[in-house]
């Protein structure tokens, strides 16, 4: 089983050209299946049956594995069996028709508008790191980029005169997004100092040494800003969630938010309507005369 897993991973890496992160996640999931098979005395991939795979999924769920993680595990198994069937090494797929247990969908964490403005209006020193980090925060909140999209930006992708940025999203799909005035100003200030360090390098966000800033480094800079300005944990996706939530709250245009986020399915975007409803419910509870309860009626 291990040998066939190695062959499949090589196929994903060399022919499918999946990202290193995805490859590592799939390998870990499939190694769990191999461990389960070894413990159950299942001799190979061709011997694994749907009842046994269902047992593994149930066991993982019982031990706290999320529905999302189990869906990824089943996706990894299906991908492996497609490969094995194509190579003539197997003739079935035990994951076919098998779904993970349904779990509660967690609402994304966001900053409210006041906290977002507190983060961005905290004041900026006129130096390389401060100007770069401010531009990163402004662009995340202005345009709702994913971490990988922002890290992969090149200078040619930005049109500050027109207030536009072109990003390459999931599945290699390109989209053009508006960039707000404050973000454009922050980027212009950053470019004033950036050009001194790497005038010929194409990456938008770079280190002092002129190298492209990694996704990990961007995560750490955002975390540092959150702790310093807000006293809380902050990550890039929280800024993306805040962008989506605040835009939907103001515009009520779900389709437009879907396009800007680069979601293939509008159901993914609809989770932000639940956040908007939470906000409306809080306003109602605090403001509507028939929603307020007197202290004497709280029993």
UniProtKB/Swiss-Prot annotation:
<dbReference type="GO" id="GO:0003677">
    <property type="term" value="F:DNA binding"/>
</dbReference>
<dbReference type="InterPro" id="IPR044068">
    <property type="entry name" value="CB"/>
</dbReference>
<keyword id="KW-0233">DNA recombination</keyword>
<dbReference type="Pfam" id="PF00589">
    <property type="entry name" value="Phage_integrase"/>
</dbReference>
<comment type="function">
    <text>Site-specific tyrosine recombinase, which acts by catalyzing the cutting and rejoining of the recombining DNA molecules. The XerC-XerD complex is essential to convert dimers of the bacterial chromosome into monomers to permit their segregation at cell division. It also contributes to the segregational stability of plasmids.</text>
</comment>
<dbReference type="GO" id="GO:0005737">
    <property type="term" value="C:cytoplasm"/>
</dbReference>
<dbReference type="Pfam" id="PF02899">
    <property type="entry name" value="Phage_int_SAM_1"/>
</dbReference>
<dbReference type="GO" id="GO:0006313">
    <property type="term" value="P:DNA transposition"/>
</dbReference>
<dbReference type="InterPro" id="IPR011010">
    <property type="entry name" value="DNA_brk_join_enz"/>
</dbReference>
<keyword id="KW-0963">Cytoplasm</keyword>
<keyword id="KW-0132">Cell division</keyword>
<dbReference type="GO" id="GO:0007059">
    <property type="term" value="P:chromosome segregation"/>
</dbReference>
<dbReference type="InterPro" id="IPR004107">
    <property type="entry name" value="Integrase_SAM-like_N"/>
</dbReference>
<keyword id="KW-0238">DNA-binding</keyword>
<feature type="active site" description="O-(3'-phospho-DNA)-tyrosine intermediate">
    <location>
        <position position="272"/>
    </location>
</feature>
<dbReference type="InterPro" id="IPR011931">
    <property type="entry name" value="Recomb_XerC"/>
</dbReference>
<dbReference type="InterPro" id="IPR002104">
    <property type="entry name" value="Integrase_catalytic"/>
</dbReference>
<comment type="subunit">
    <text>Forms a cyclic heterotetrameric complex composed of two molecules of XerC and two molecules of XerD.</text>
</comment>
<feature type="active site">
    <location>
        <position position="146"/>
    </location>
</feature>
<keyword id="KW-0159">Chromosome partition</keyword>
<dbReference type="GO" id="GO:0009037">
    <property type="term" value="F:tyrosine-based site-specific recombinase activity"/>
</dbReference>
<feature type="active site">
    <location>
        <position position="237"/>
    </location>
</feature>
<dbReference type="InterPro" id="IPR050090">
    <property type="entry name" value="Tyrosine_recombinase_XerCD"/>
</dbReference>
<feature type="active site">
    <location>
        <position position="263"/>
    </location>
</feature>
<feature type="domain" description="Tyr recombinase">
    <location>
        <begin position="106"/>
        <end position="285"/>
    </location>
</feature>
<protein>
    <recommendedName>
        <fullName>Tyrosine recombinase XerC</fullName>
    </recommendedName>
</protein>
<feature type="active site">
    <location>
        <position position="240"/>
    </location>
</feature>
<comment type="similarity">
    <text>Belongs to the 'phage' integrase family. XerC subfamily.</text>
</comment>
<keyword id="KW-0229">DNA integration</keyword>
<keyword id="KW-0131">Cell cycle</keyword>
<feature type="domain" description="Core-binding (CB)">
    <location>
        <begin position="1"/>
        <end position="85"/>
    </location>
</feature>
<dbReference type="GO" id="GO:0051301">
    <property type="term" value="P:cell division"/>
</dbReference>
<dbReference type="InterPro" id="IPR013762">
    <property type="entry name" value="Integrase-like_cat_sf"/>
</dbReference>
<dbReference type="InterPro" id="IPR010998">
    <property type="entry name" value="Integrase_recombinase_N"/>
</dbReference>
<dbReference type="InterPro" id="IPR023009">
    <property type="entry name" value="Tyrosine_recombinase_XerC/XerD"/>
</dbReference>
<feature type="active site">
    <location>
        <position position="170"/>
    </location>
</feature>
């Amino acid at each position: 089983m291990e040998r066939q897993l190695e062959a499949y991973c090589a196929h994903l890496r060399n022919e499918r050209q999946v990202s290193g992160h995805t490859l590592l996640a799939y390998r870990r999931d499939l190694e769990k299946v191999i461990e389960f098979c070894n413990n159950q005395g299942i001799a190979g991939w061709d011997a694994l049956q749907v009842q046994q795979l269902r047992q593994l999924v149930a066991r993982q769920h019982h031990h706290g594995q999320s529905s999302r993680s189990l869906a990824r595990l089943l996706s990894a198994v299906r991908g492996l069996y497609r490969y094995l069937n194509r190579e003539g090494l197997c003739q079935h797929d035990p994951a076919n028709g098998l779904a993970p247990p349904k779990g509660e969908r967690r609402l994304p964490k966001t900053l409210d508008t006041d906290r977002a403005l507190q983060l961005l209006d905290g004041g900026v020193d006129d130096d390389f790191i401060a100007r770069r980090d401010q531009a990163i925060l402004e662009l995340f909140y202005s345009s709702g980029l994913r971490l990988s999209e922002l890290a992969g930006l090149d200078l040619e992708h930005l049109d500050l005169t027109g207030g536009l940025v072109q990003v390459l999203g999931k599945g290699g799909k390109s989209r053009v997004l508006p960039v707000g005035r404050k973000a454009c100003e922050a980027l212009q200030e950053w470019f004033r100092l950036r050009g001194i360090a790497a005038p010929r390098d194409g990456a938008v966000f770079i280190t002092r040494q002129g190298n492209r800033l990694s996704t990990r480094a961007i995560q750490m800079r955002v975390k540092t800003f959150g702790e310093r300005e807000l006293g809380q944990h902050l990550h890039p996706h929280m800024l993306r969630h805040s962008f989506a939530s605040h835009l939907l709250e103001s515009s009520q245009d779900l389709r437009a938010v879907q396009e800007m986020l680069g979601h293939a399915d509008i159901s993914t975007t609809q989770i932000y309507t639940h956040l908007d409803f939470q906000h409306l419910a809080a306003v109602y509870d605090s403001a509507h005369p028939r929603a307020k309860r007197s202290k004497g009626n709280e029993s």
